[in-house]
């Protein structure tokens, strides 16, 4: 839905036609239906609790693979644009939640080790597992990190920074570094 969201906003900016703004809002509502609006509770022994991961603002990977990822950081600039176009503060709040989630548990140095995996500076998990996937796995599996450190999570954050400018209010966030 992100390409449609962005296109609707581009067309609204170009034409001023309110129908495109309405379509952008429809895309935003749909996109928002895939995001966590709350922070789930996890045992103190979980990765989520130990490293300070919060579910609010995370995006569901898919219906059949309900992990959480930071894909929403890609759409954060469009939520800011929609806020500007409508004046509706909820869209800025959604952008902020998406951004905050996308900046959780980033390794700030080359010494961060999680689950035996040394994280490079700037490394972040590709997915966060809020639940266990099968009854054959232990319940304790809830709230764990995968250890796949791929580049798209960083690329999407960089896109948002490039689009909005580094000093944008969206990026004035509290400390979200990975707690050792």
List PLM regions with ranges.
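Glycan-recognition and catalytic cores of secretory/periplasmic carbohydrate-active enzymes
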Residues: 1-180
């Amino acid at each position: 839905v992100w390409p449609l969201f962005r296109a609707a906003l581009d067309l609204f900016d170009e034409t001023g036609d309110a129908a495109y703004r309405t379509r952008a809002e429809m895309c935003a509502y749909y996109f928002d239906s895939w995001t966590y609006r709350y922070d789930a509770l996890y045992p103190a022994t979980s990765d989520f609790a130990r490293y300070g991961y919060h579910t609010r603002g995370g995006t569901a990977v898919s219906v059949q693979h309900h992990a959480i990822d930071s894909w929403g950081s890609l759409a954060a600039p469009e939520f800011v644009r929609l806020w500007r176009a409508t004046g509706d503060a909820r869209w800025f709040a959604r952008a902020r939640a998406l951004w905050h989630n996308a900046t959780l548990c980033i390794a700030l140095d080359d010494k961060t080790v999680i689950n035996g995996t040394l994280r490079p500076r700037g490394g972040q998990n590709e997915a966060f597992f809020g639940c266990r996937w099968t009854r054959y796995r232990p319940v304790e599996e809830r709230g764990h990190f995968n250890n796949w450190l791929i580049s798209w999570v960083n690329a999407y954050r960089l896109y948002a920074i490039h689009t909005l400018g580094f000093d944008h209010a969206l990026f004035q966030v509290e400390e979200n570094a990975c707690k050792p």
